[in-house]
Amino acid sequence: WNMEERFQGHQDSPLTETGRRQVTALGRRLKAMAFDRLISSDLGRTRETAAIIAQYTGHTVHADRRLRERHYGVLEGLNAKEIHEQHPGVYQELITENPDYVIPEGQTHRQHYHQNIEVLNEWAGGTPGTTAALVAHGGVLDNFFRHVAHLDLRHPRCVLPANASISIIQHGTFYGSLRWVIKTWGDAAHLETLEPH
């Protein structure tokens, strides 16, 4: 679905063989990193990712539906061209970046954003000194980035981390104020040695 640039949302698909190889490399790398909890979206593709990681790190996987990708309703399974042809009014709303537009049978960007940030604050920001690894989707990572960088929800997506990459955000006191900061974004060094298939 990613390779075809389809709006996947809550629809599911298994990892490809390339995806499994990437996640295996990620698991090997995360084995050397200390963290307390492993939390995943409850969708199959992220649960599969988290299960592979857990084979290397030994963590129990906690599934949280609030880490799901945005619910794209009638758009799920379609690419931009198909959306433009089949749902021209919805397409026009999407390109305006209106965070309060409700996709038919789906949700608004603002609803998705708030559920994602709730998880971030609860799992990773709730207890001082706690480190959590969150296995999530591109839209969720985009919302985390927006939250930390204080970007308006109308701002177009400006970061596209690679699949199976590592992004680290930290909650703490920096320069005298308590806040989230981005330490690393989209680090995919562990994927550089993979042979292409």
PLM feature spans:
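Active-site signature of alpha/beta-hydrolase-fold catalytic machinery across serine-
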Residues: 52, 143-147
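Domain-level recognition of soluble alpha/beta enzyme cores
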Residues: 152-176
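Glycine-rich phosphate-binding loop signature in dinucleotide/nucleotide-binding domains
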Residues: 31-34, 123-130
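Alpha-helical packing segments of well-folded alpha/beta enzyme cores
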Residues: 22, 26, 46, 112-120
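An N-terminal RHG(E/S)-centered segment typical of histidine phosphatases
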Residues: 1-37, 48-51, 55-59, 74-81, ...
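Phosphate-handling substructures
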Residues: 14, 55-118, 181, 195-197
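Short glycine-rich phosphate-binding loop at a beta-alpha junction
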Residues: 35-42, 131-135
